[in-house]
Amino acid sequence: MIAVQPMKEEDQAQLSLLMMELTGTQTDATVFGRTFRKILEDQQYILLGAYHNGELAGTAMGIVCMDLTGDCRPFMVVENVVVSANHRKLGIGRQLMLAMEEQAKERNCYYVILVSGKQRVEAHRLYESLGYRDEGAEGFRKHF
């Protein structure tokens, strides 16, 4: 059985392993812990975990952003959607995204936006099956 719920401090070690699976790099444990706690405390962040038989199998992070256009309703940016390789093909990514969309609706967001690497073809199929589409916008990123 899969349970999707907000993450807690005791999930830190398992989440660190998931993030390493996503990026291929290990984050300094002290920095990771400090940032993790800040995210948990910030009401504009939603950090969800998907648990399969009590084990953290996936995660997604949403950030609610204010907007100054139209009705000034907020929107949500979704980042760091990852399902462990050991738990794929169980519908976990879909459940995480649907739960994140519910969080966005509860916060009166008028849309959800996400960026996904071109190589993540399977993830793109999931997003498209959930109604996400390419609106002709280009994503740009600058690293510092």
Task: Outline where the language-model segments fall.
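A short beta-loop-alpha structural element at the N-terminal edge
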Residues: 1-15
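Helix-loop element at the rim of GNAT/NAT acetyltransferase active sites that forms part
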Residues: 17-30
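Active-site rim helix/loop that mediates acceptor-substrate recognition in acyltransferases
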Residues: 27-47
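Conserved beta-strand in the GNAT
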Residues: 49, 55-64, 77, 82
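A conserved beta-turn-beta hairpin within the catalytic core of GNAT-like acetyltransferases
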Residues: 67-78, 88, 136
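Conserved acetyl-CoA-binding loop-helix of GNAT-fold acetyltransferases
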Residues: 83, 89-102, 129
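Conserved active-site alpha-helix within GNAT-family acetyltransferase domains
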Residues: 94, 106, 118-136, 142
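Conserved GNAT acetyl-CoA-binding A-motif
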Residues: 97, 104-116
